[in-house]
Swiss-Prot record:
Name of the encoding gene: aphA
Primary enzyme class: hydrolase
SUPFAM superfamilies from the UniProt entry: HAD-like (SSF56784)
InterPro entries: Acid_phosphat_B-like (IPR005519), HAD-like_sf (IPR036412), HAD-SF_ppase_IIIB_AphA (IPR010025), HAD_sf (IPR023214)
Designated name of the protein: Class B acid phosphatase
Amino acid sequence: MKNVMKLSVIALLTAAAVPAMAGKTEPYTQSGTNAREMLQEQAIHWISVDQIKQSLEGKAPINVSFDIDDTVMLFSSPCFYHGQQKFSPGKHDYLKNQDFWNEVNAGCDKYSIPKQIAIDLINMHQARGDQVYFFTGRTAGKVDGVTPILEKTFNIKNMHPVEFMGSRERTTKYNKTPAIISHKVSIHYGDSDDDVLAAKEAGVRGIRLMRAANSTYQPMPTLGGYGEEVLINSSY
């Protein structure tokens, strides 16, 4: 009798534990994915802010540079969308229109949203004593309203003027390479292929940030396409 009772208790306990370890109740109809597979699906060198910090431990302060649009600013897209609608609806000719650059660089970025990952990165670098620079592929406007906005937004301790590389003459293949070299940058952060390739051309460490899926800057680049490090959770 005692043995029967013991078996009954064990059976009840086992049944109670089943829901906690239960599998899917219905077979999936689509391939789908999960959080781990999303990170493991492709051979990408993912890296975190903490890992970057660890890689710099014991090293003297360095110079680091950031692209602006889609890298430190989550949503500068409205400025470009407005510019396209105003100066060349349905076309990209507005990017060659100096009136557009005068307008967007004069202060449109005050409507942009900073990326949290950029705030975390910049805070980490400034805590180390690193110097922060901003390089952009934009063409310079008559007034630089970008520098003071970035200085305030990211609480930059020793702000350097933004380098507008879009219209500068160069002997390099990529437009940010001269700035990376002249400012002795050790790490360059950016979302575009040109950012990654400019870092490679300059011979420095390039780390890619993810571009937000709803950015107007299309097509989307391939993360890890050049074997570069990619900052995890960096689309926002």
